[in-house]
Structures are given as C-alpha cells and as structure tokens.
Amino acid sequence: MKPDCDLLIIGGGINGCGIARDAAGRGLSVCLAEMNDIGSATSASSTKLFHGGLRYLEYFELRLVREALIEREVLLRAMPHISWPMRFVLPHHRSMRFDMTTPTSRLLNVVMPWMRGRRPAWLIRLGLFLYDNLGGRKILPGTSRLDLRSAPEGRGLNPKFEKAFEYSDCWVEDSRLVVLNARDAEARGARIMPRTKVTGAEVVDGLWHVTLQEGDQSRTITAKMVVNAAGPWVGDVLRGTLKSNSQSGVRLVRGSHIVTKRLFDHDKCYFFQGTDGRIIFAIPYETDFTLIGTTDMDHTDADVKPQITPEEQSYLIDFINGYLAKPISDADVVWTYSGVRPLYDDGASSASAATRDYVIKTDTSRGAPALSVFGGKITTYRRLAETALEQIAHHFDGVDKVWTAGVPLPGGDFPVDGVDALVTGLKRDFPFLTDRWALRLVRAYGTEAAQMLDGAKTLADLGTDFGATLTAREVTWLMDKEYARTAQDVVWRRSKLGLRMDAAEIDRLQGWMKDHAQQSNAAAAE
C-alpha cells in the first residue's frame, strides 16, 4: 500500500514548520497538521530574538551557544526583512549577583569564596569575549564599552549605573518566521493543514494511520513516519496519541512579557541583570513601545492558556524599576503576552536552570517510526530540522542533502542592508504610502510587498481601510497566502497592529474576513 505521505508532522510551530520545509526540499512528501493557527502557541510568544543566549554560558552550555551564534548570521542572511541586527547595552554595578544555582557560581564559590556571589566586570568581559568569538562572527559588530555618564544610552537610567558593555544579537518577527517556513514548505510540495487536530494514530502493516479532525469533518491519512513536534503537547501526543512507552519528559515553563509605551529615545536594547541573578530584556518594539521580559515559571498543564499573573507583572515592573530613573507602574502596561516553553526535562532544580537545548528521539516500538522533538530555541530551529532529517533519512530512499543554510524565505531575497532601498522603491512605485507604512510592509513582506500592492494606483485601490494602515488588499493576501482566518490571526500574529487598533476596528475586520471567506468558498464551489 502506498502511503499518502512520507512524513506526517504533528504541530505547526517553528520546529514543525522548519522540519516540513527542510524535508519537502529534500524530496520527501510531507503533511503537517496544526490544531490551531500556524505558529499560534509557543512560537508566537518568544522574546523575539535570534541570539546565542549569553546567560547560558553560566550553565556551560557551550555547544548550544556556539550553534546559536553561528545560526544568527545564517538566518539573518535568509530573512533580512523579518530579522535585523540590534545592539544590547548591559549596564554593570558592583551589586550584581549570580544566580547561586548556576555551575559558574558554584565553581567560583569554591575557588574564589571571597567574591560572595558577586558578578564582577572582569567575568562579564570574559563571557562577552567568548560570545564574540565562539560563533565565527562575520556580520555583527563585536563588544564595546560605554560610559553611561555621557553616552545617550545612559539617559533614562538610574545614575548609579555609570559603566556598561555593548554587544550584538538579532531581532526576529517570530510569528512571521513560522508562517514563512510553512509557506516555503508548501511551495516545495508540503501539504499544510491548519486548524486540523490529530485525534488518533495506529500502525497497520508498517504504516501509520492517522485520524485528522477539521471542524466537524474527520478523515484518515497514512504515513511512513510520524514527527511529533507538538511543542507543549509533545508528551501528550507521545504517550496518548502515539501510545509510546517512552519515559522522555517535557518541562513546561511559562515566560511572560509586558509591553509599555516607549521608555527610551534610541533603538538599542538593554540586558538587565537582577540582584537575584536573573536577567530581563528591554527591547524597542513596534516603533512606539518597549517590550520587557521574560519570567521563568513552571506551568502545570499545556491545555491551560498561559497568562501573566499579577506576581509576574509586579516582578517585571520592580525588576526594571531598579534600572530606571523614572519608575513605571501597572498603568504604563499597554499589553501583555505569555507563552509556554516545552523544555526537555533534565531534572534541573529551577525553571531558569532547565536546558534550552533540543533533544530528538526516535521510537520504532509500534512497528513504524515516530520521531519526537523536545525543547529547542527559536534561533536553532533550522539546525534542529537538519538534525531531525539526519535521524529520518535512513528510513527513506534517495533523500537529498542539506540545503536550507542561507536559502531565503519568501520575501527575503535581498541583501542584509537592503531594507532602505526596498522602502525607497516601494514608495516610488506606490506614492500614496507614507514612510512608516512602507517600512512596515517591507519589514513584513520584503520583496513580496510590491507583489501584494501590484496594480494599485491610489489608496482607494487597496479596498476597505480597517485602521492602522491595514487594508483589504493586505488582509486578502494574508487569507489567501498565509493561512489567516480570524482577526486575531491578522492583528496579533501576522502583524502586531492590535497595538494600534481598537476593539470596534478589530470587530469590523472580523466581520469582513467572515464575509470574504464565505464569498471565496461559494466561488470555489461553483
């Protein structure tokens, strides 16, 4: 019996979509089922950084940090529209302390007990030297020192912070990263099925028979192999749906963020160290806002929607107020979001200490292979996919070689420093666009922005204006090409325009999308 596909991937987050893209590009037939919107769970709720993970050096996770540092620049070249370099300012004060549970702090307590848990400047310099050199940096500038008493980055900070270090990492639009991987997988032959839940799986004559539920419709497809990339639900799928006896576990860790009005008058980020040894970031966000996070809290149930608790919000506010000249309060918070990280359960004593590295395990006990993905960072998703394919390849004939390094995602076929030129060209071809609107479109769609606007001579040609520069032309593109079905998909995942739209505008958008979907379905049925 010929199966419907080689791989059935469960989960449409960054790991599932990354594996789907890689596998489809190697000639495998791929189906991917995601029970909700593409990239709507963990992958939509990160701190939105492509970074090596400076703090992971304290846990001696050198392999993870090196791999992530190398990947920063590989990914930057492949998606310069949704990812870009940023400089991070790390203020230092003699009161800085280690998290006393880290391997580094335990070692120093033995060899240098007089330090009493302090995090000295020389040790930060050493860590940043490693950070600059572990990954063979080629594009990003290296570490420098700042005098906060005279540098603009010192304005807005408590004057007790006089010195700082500055290093490089990258921003990424996480939700768009997932969608673009799904689109590219589909362009290479994969079948992407959002809002389709896997409700059962059994092995018959060496093939997986997987039951899918979409709305009130149920069907079964067959596959040679199942890939369990269900994120927070990976354990449930492994032992429930796939009926595996594997003891591999997942630790659910909730990370919460707050968004305030813009706190600083420059475009650099801050890496703030707490007196408890933890760190948070303060990052320029959507031009007019500042993103602050994250927390690390154990989360008991993947089916319980993650939401910031009052204690987490107070923690983030108190933490950043230790650095600000002008404190903020709950009244300054305009939005919050939380996500659950499905970390491999390595028995760590705290959520912060749990490894961020990925673990991939294959089980053949049911009579057909199933691969499960635990953990991972958004920065290493492409390497995770390559590693998964290394484990998958011997189950199939004629699997092509690795190929994804540096291959652009949709809209990313332009130089890393080419955004300004694209914005200029877009404004020339569509003169009704403002500077800010054109930049938003380029940052979202890259070279495809012109394709989306093709034929428009005036603003009216873009159709209904929903507010915040969102028009019917763009929404139609998102529905036709990017799997969007609801207003929430559009304003909180494909974009962050929900920060600039009120409830009435979002309701109007939802009504329009419902009508448009009905009209499209009726036309397709004729």
Name each region found by the language model.
Residues 2-13:
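Beta1/beta-strand and adjacent pyrophosphate-binding region of the FAD-binding site
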Residues 36, 82, 97-104, 114-118, ...:
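C-terminal accessory subdomains/tails of enzymes that are appended
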Residues 194-208:
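A conserved short coil-to-beta-strand element within the FAD-binding core of flavoproteins
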